[in-house]
Amino acid sequence: MGCFAKIAAQAGILAFLQFGKTITESKKEPIKLLKLLDIFASLNKLRLDFNRLFGGAACIEIQNLTRDLIKRVIDGAAEIFWEIFVQVELQRQSPPPQDGSIPKVVSSITDYCNKLLGDDYRPILTQVLVIHQSWKHKKFQEMILVNEVSKIIKAVDLNLDTWMKAYGDTTLSCLFAMNCHWHLYKDLKGTKLGELMGDSWLKEHEQYKEYYSAIFFRESWAKLPVHLSREGLIMFSGGRASARDLVKKRLKTFNEAFDEMYRKQSGWVIPERDLREKTCQLIVQTVLPVYRSYMQTYGPLVEQDASSSKYAKYTVQGLEQMLLSLFLPRRERYGSFKGRPTGSKIDNGVDLRRTASAVA
């Protein structure tokens, strides 16, 4: 090894090349592709300087290590890129999130593909694929990158269809579909990936979100107001005692249905804040006006009853707070209003006329 080569080695060039080799030998995960592309871009920028500085026979070890590293980087990057589609397909066998939230693989893959199509990585990945194809004596086709990314996203679509069918609860399945379709529409609109998939694809996901949202409401919260029927109570036709019994019965049925629905859905998650707030507001608009009106009109019938708190179980304000606290991600639940039914009960002895006035 010549004098200059020794100085270069002592300066850390060999250690740098060895470090790059170590990265190529580590586990081949999708996120590693970006690191390999960064390494390739750095080596490519230094190529002319490397050739000028280390082109002599004395630097043969550095030359060999550099060529080996470049080959490892290109082979590794290409291998990971072509493996992404396979990995997405394999994820189809995994169960969907129990809380109906967006699977991490969906959000990570869409974000990942957006980066690959972006101005920072697309030219580098294209160059890597061109070189890799030439080594295999294959002609590089211009659309190979976008076609593969499109295929990956369509595989994600198929995963969503499969995961939806894995839920045993229709409303949870619909909530999951709402989450995923809204994520694909909202997060990809105006992005490189969204442009690739096209406006019709984006619009389709927006429409699917609306469709499953309608089913979600129809199969869950829209069923609650029917328990507060006014039939037979308009003129207290059966007498005050009969009317009171009927009101108590209907309030009890409403409370049981509400408690069960709230208990079940309080563990579900809508990660996107705008969708969560809109969903909660729609639930409030579906349930609260009917409950408020019913309590204003018929609350006084049970106010003198010793067990009134069993029937007039919630204040309107308490009910609203509970509904608005639904679907929070786990990390946001702590320190916020939990909305437990026990926390919104009217204590024994509280004048129910205050409840009636509070709903005005």
PLM region descriptions:
Residues 1-360:
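Long alpha-helical rod scaffolds of large eukaryotic non-enzymatic complex subunits
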